[in-house]
């Protein structure tokens, strides 16, 4: 499984990269706007930091606008993957961009049929939003499983990015079904480190070691 961070916060990205477990980053207009950063500069900075796939989203919604914007974004770095919304003009844009060798990530995917359209158009990635599906009473991970089956049936090379991840359980479920990529907020990645028995065990080891060192000191005095 590849782990992407879903953030535009450069400090979070640097920390995750320093741990050696972050393979890429996904952003969207909301995440970038929270950082009060110049879009192009921030995307370049992220690409220089992670040196892996970095998804940056277009804000146009018409075919010509999306293609123009996508070409400009793709020129920012070799690591850029252009996020395109799953709408008719978006699929048309993905087809054009894929022919030009520009990597794309079909975003706002909520059904296996949408993912199928993106794969047929040549999308590099599709991003099903599992958390938002859970919010409306569906089981988001079921959609990922169905997409996996469809892609396997027809040999599509499009990778699945499990998106809209809310908690570590989503990551576990994605891993159990063999998802290609999970993109998550930094706080979810942090939570994956944590287990109460780890803390208890570490504290016990350190206390025992301290007692042993104190014992050695007392013998030498």
Curated annotation (Swiss-Prot):
The domain of life is: Bacteria
- Please provide the record's keywords in A-Z order: Cytoplasm, Pentose shunt, Schiff base, Transferase
Active site positions, chain numbering: 83
Q: What job does the chain carry out?
A: Transaldolase is important for the balance of metabolites in the pentose-phosphate pathway.
HAMAP family membership: Transaldolase_3b
The record's listing under NCBIfam families reads: fsa_talC_mipB
Q: Which family is annotated?
A: Belongs to the transaldolase family. Type 3B subfamily.
Quote the protein name from its UniProt record.
Probable transaldolase
Q: What is the scientific name of the source organism?
A: Petrotoga mobilis (strain DSM 10674 / SJ95)
């Amino acid at each position: 499984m590849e782990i992407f961070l879903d953030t535009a916060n450069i400090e979070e990205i640097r920390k995750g990269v320093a741990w050696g477990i972050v393979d890429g980053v996904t952003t969207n207009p909301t995440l970038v706007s929270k950082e009060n950063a110049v879009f192009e500069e921030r995307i370049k900075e992220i690409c220089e930091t992670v040196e892996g796939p970095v998804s940056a989203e277009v804000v146009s919604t018409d075919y010509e606008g999306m293609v123009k914007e996508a070409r400009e974004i793709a020129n920012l770095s070799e690591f850029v993957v252009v996020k395109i919304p799953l709408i008719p003009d978006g699929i048309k844009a993905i087809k054009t961009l894929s022919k030009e060798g520009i990597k794309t990530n079909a975003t706002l995917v909520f059904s296996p049929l949408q993912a199928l359209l993106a794969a047929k158009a040549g999308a590099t990635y599709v991003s099903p939003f599992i958390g938002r599906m859970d919010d409306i009473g569906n089981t988001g991970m079921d959609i990922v499983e169905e997409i996996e089956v469809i892609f396997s049936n027809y040999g599509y090379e499009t990778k699945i990015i499990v998106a809209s991840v809310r908690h570590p359980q989503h990551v576990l479920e994605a891993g159990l079904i063999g998802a290609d990529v999970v993109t998550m907020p930094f706080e979810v990645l942090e939570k994956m480190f944590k287990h109460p028995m780890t803390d208890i065990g570490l504290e016990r080891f350190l206390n025992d070691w301290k007692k042993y060192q104190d014992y050695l000191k007392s013998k030498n005095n």
